[in-house]
Regions:
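A conserved short coil-to-beta-strand element within the FAD-binding core of flavoproteins
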Residues: 121-135
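Single conserved hydrophobic/aromatic residue that forms the stacking wall/gate
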Residues: 230-237
């Protein structure tokens, strides 16, 4: 029987799994096809692809700075340079703001953390039971897993739905609404545009990333990740 079952392969889930794996048996499960959670990388062909979730990291706390510094030293992360166009008039620009990205994709952190751990994809947790101090986990694909301990690293609404029967916390009384963050993955003919990103001042269009500027690949087309949020779109209607 497993010592620990971790649900979610994002940065939090993968970091916890790596630490636990030093002393315990650990398996990780995720409903998606690949690793990364909110930092997923959409592969087009070979190394060519898009960061369609997390666009970059900009560490603030001392601990996270140490964490990213070590990953940069190990060439898991790198600095995203270039000309980043700051157009937003409601946010103050920080001159010391840095942008860190994965060397091959922004799911590189999770891949690195989970490289020696068994990961199961397309496993969406649908039901939880606890019997004789053992967690019985039922997935939508029909599989049932038993584990001594359970760690859930998934969005709040999903967590509340699955765990409110077993976990007593005032946090579940909070009314949390998660709005969609929509991203268009766009391919265009090669242009002379030399900007790495745009932080716009538009009510709908929030962010544009030039994926080619991340220097992970060379390609005869330009790749763009264009993002906006449900809230911004709703405000205009």
């Amino acid at each position: 029987m497993l010592d620990f079952c971790v649900i979610g392969t994002g940065i939090s889930g993968s970091t916890i799994a790596k630490l636990l794996n030093q002393k315990f048996s650990v398996n990780v499960y995720d409903k998606a096809k690949g690793i990364g959670g909110r930092s997923s990388f959409k592969r087009l062909n070979g190394k060519i692809g898009f960061d369609h979730g997390l666009q970059y990291l900009s560490p603030r706390s001392l601990k996270f700075k140490r964490f990213t510094k070590e990953l940069t030293r190990k060439k898991i992360l790198k600095f995203w340079g270039g000309n980043h166009k700051f157009l937003n008039k409601s946010v103050k620009k920080k001159n010391k703001h840095i942008k860190l990205i994965g060397v091959n994709g922004n799911n590189d952190i999770s891949k690195y953390q989970l490289k020696n751990i068994k990961c199961y994809h397309q496993y969406e947790l649908s039901k939880i039971n606890r019997l004789n101090k053992v967690w019985n986990l039922q997935f939508q694909n029909g599989q049932v897993i038993k584990s001594k301990n359970l760690i859930v690293s998934i969005p709040f609404p999903q967590c509340k739905k699955l765990l409110s029967k077993f976990v007593r916390t005032s946090l579940f009384k909070n009314k949390v609404i998660m709005n969609s963050s929509l991203t268009v993955l766009l391919m265009t003919n090669k242009t002379s545009n030399n900007y790495s990103s745009y932080f716009t001042n538009d009510k709908i269009l929030g962010w544009v990333s030039n994926e080619n500027s991340k220097k992970r690949f060379t390609y005869n087309k330009d790749l763009w990740a264009v993002s906006y949020t449900h809230l911004r779109a709703h405000e205009t209607t």
